[in-house]
């Protein structure tokens, strides 16, 4: 059953990615992508971004204006600031309600497509052998554990295969993270050495100038 083997591996990989990046991060990414499409909330999201830019611009200008020396200008900016703030809060409240519903729907679909699908596969194919072990290579208790709970004795059950996939994915993920950290650390070290080499001639030149000045004195 190569297709079932690959399906189990893919589901476990998706679960690992969700756990690694976090559900909130994925929800925010999907929400931003959703608002880029011609959806009912895309216009509201665009207006909110526009209001936010105007609000920040007015706020910066108001903070840069003295309320004592330029009171008339400051008061006008203050009224604009308060008006934009109220509009921004109303827009944010409306979008937050929609986003909450969106997050709930996405979280439900994500669970059904990952953990729910994994549980369904493990239940539906619990009596089916993923593949068979070479006869006589493993003791009875090992064959029993690998076929647990309901697969034929001497075979690999879907539960055992799922655990093996999870272990391999975790090991590969940790190895990739370690390699990336090592490469970034090596680059940082090389850049630090280059910076030190550039500083040494500058220090030497500065010391030479100081000595020359002392001799002249």
From Swiss-Prot:
What Gene3D superfamilies has UniProt attached to this entry?
Helix hairpin bin
- Could you list this entry's UniProt keywords, alphabetically sorted: Coiled coil, Endoplasmic reticulum, Membrane, Transmembrane, Transmembrane helix, Transport
In terms of superkingdom, the source organism counts as Eukaryota
State the function annotated in the UniProt record. Required for the post-translational delivery of tail-anchored (TA) proteins to the endoplasmic reticulum. Acts as a membrane receptor for soluble get3, which recognizes and selectively binds the transmembrane domain of TA proteins in the cytosol.
A single GO cellular-component term on record: endoplasmic reticulum membrane
Relate the assembly described in the record: Interacts with get3.
Residues covered by region (Disordered): 195-217
Where, if anywhere, are coiled coils annotated? 43-97
Q: Where in the cell is it found?
A: Endoplasmic reticulum membrane
One GO MF term: protein-membrane adaptor activity
- State whether keyword NADP applies: no
Membership in a protein family? Belongs to the WRB/GET1 family.
Q: Which organism is it from?
A: Sclerotinia sclerotiorum (strain ATCC 18683 / 1980 / Ss-1)
Q: Which residues lie on this side of the membrane: Lumenal?
A: 1-4, 132-155
Q: What residues form the membrane-spanning segments?
A: 5-24, 111-131, 156-172
Checking Pfam families in the record gives:
CHD5 (PF04420)
Quote the protein name from its UniProt record.
Protein get1
Q: Which residues lie on this side of the membrane: Cytoplasmic?
A: 25-110, 173-217
Stated membrane topology is: Multi-pass membrane protein
* Biological processes, Gene Ontology terms: tail-anchored membrane protein insertion into ER membrane
